[in-house]
């Protein structure tokens, strides 16, 4: 049975931990608001660009003049998986859920005889994936020095992907991230970015005149579209990370409070037992006299 001193030290230690988790929860809440605002501000542009490109892609179709980013290489042998996770932990199952989805996708491709290459964005994903898929790694993007996510970061990642695609290093690129829904709900998502995939009808291209041509405009927009998709994914990931961390720290704070209550009850019982024992000894001594 722990001594009163040990129990008192444990109570003090848990109280200090609760202060830390509460502070982290408040910081995550503030960062979450900023991340949500950034994600919401980027959506109209991304949706409009997607609508225009969808309409152009529908007009261009699978013609011989279709841009390579739309038509693809004609093969799907080599797949590049871009796995986006956080630089830090203490955010519940946020990182592991994205890694789990990427790992399952890689296993499926390998079973089909495909070649898999992995590019990680964020420290935590690299740490987890290197354990069993280290031989498939081709690069890593370090975001530890990025204080606030901006479009130039997405442009840099997109430029790297486009250069690798032009060099023939892969046929299909898919990004993995968590789509933000709420503080307690972040959905792991896989989204193909190269070659471009469009759903729906989008803007009707016949309503516009494109110069020099629809193919030329689409060829210019597609690289921007890749960067925009990556930027949107990074923003969604950022909001999801802060939401997950806020939820995890809230749970940790509550658990710390419950533990303090249990330890306090145990401390009081032990103290009461010690006092009772001393009283019994005093009374017994008095009776002996």
UniProtKB/Swiss-Prot annotation:
Q: Which residues form a coiled coil?
A: none
Where does the record place it?
Cell inner membrane
What CDD domains is this protein classified in? F1-ATPase_gamma (cd12151)
What pairs make up the disulfide bonds? Answer: none
SUPFAM superfamilies found in the cross-reference section: ATP synthase (F1-ATPase), gamma subunit
Listed GO molecular functions?
ATP binding; proton-transporting ATP synthase activity, rotational mechanism
Main localization category = membrane
InterPro entries for this protein: ATP_synth_F1_ATPase_gsu, ATP_synth_F1_gsu, ATP_synth_F1_gsu_CS
- Establish whether keyword Transmembrane helix is in the entry: no
Out of the domains of life, which is the source? Answer: Bacteria
Q: How does it sit in the membrane?
A: Peripheral membrane protein
Pfam families assigned to the protein according to its UniProt record, in alphabetical order: ATP-synt
Q: Spell out the family assignment given in the record's similarity comment.
A: Belongs to the ATPase gamma chain family.
What exactly does this protein do? Produces ATP from ADP in the presence of a proton gradient across the membrane. The gamma chain is believed to be important in regulating ATPase activity and the flow of protons through the CF(0) complex.
Q: Name the chain's protein.
A: ATP synthase gamma chain
Protein's organism: Cereibacter sphaeroides (strain ATCC 17029 / ATH 2.4.9)
């Amino acid at each position: 049975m722990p001594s009163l001193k040990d129990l008192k030290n444990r109570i003090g230690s848990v109280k200090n931990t609760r202060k830390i988790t509460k502070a982290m929860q408040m910081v995550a809440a503030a960062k979450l608001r900023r991340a949500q605002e950034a994600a919401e501000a980027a959506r109209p542009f991304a949706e409009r660009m997607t609508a225009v490109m969808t309409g152009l892609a529908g007009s261009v179709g699978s013609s011989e003049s279709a841009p390579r980013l739309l038509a693809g290489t004609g093969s799907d042998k080599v797949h590049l998986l871009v796995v986006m996770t956080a630089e830090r932990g203490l955010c519940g199952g946020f990182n592991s859920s994205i890694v789990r989805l990427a790992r399952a996708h890689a296993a499926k491709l390998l079973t089909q005889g495909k070649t898999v290459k992995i590019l990680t964005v964020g420290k935590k994903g690299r740490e987890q994936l290197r354990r069993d898929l280290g031989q498939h790694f081709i690069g890593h993007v370090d975001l530890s020095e990025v204080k606030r996510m901006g479009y130039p970061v997405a442009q840099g990642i997109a430029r790297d992907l486009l250069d690798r695609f032009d060099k023939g290093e892969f046929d299909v690129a898919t990004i993995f991230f968590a789509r933000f829904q709420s503080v307690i709900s972040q959905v792991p998502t896989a989204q193909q970015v190269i070659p471009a995939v469009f759903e729906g009808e989008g803007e009707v291209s016949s309503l516009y005149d494109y110069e020099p041509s629809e193919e030329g405009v689409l060829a210019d927009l597609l690289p921007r579209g890749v960067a925009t998709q990556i930027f949107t994914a990074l923003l969604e990931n950022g909001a999801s990370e802060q939401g997950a961390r806020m939820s995890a720290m809230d749970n940790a704070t509550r658990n710390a409070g419950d533990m303090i209550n249990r330890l306090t009850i145990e401390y009081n019982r032990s103290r009461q037992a010690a006092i009772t024992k001393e009283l019994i000894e005093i009374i017994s001594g008095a009776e002996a006299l």
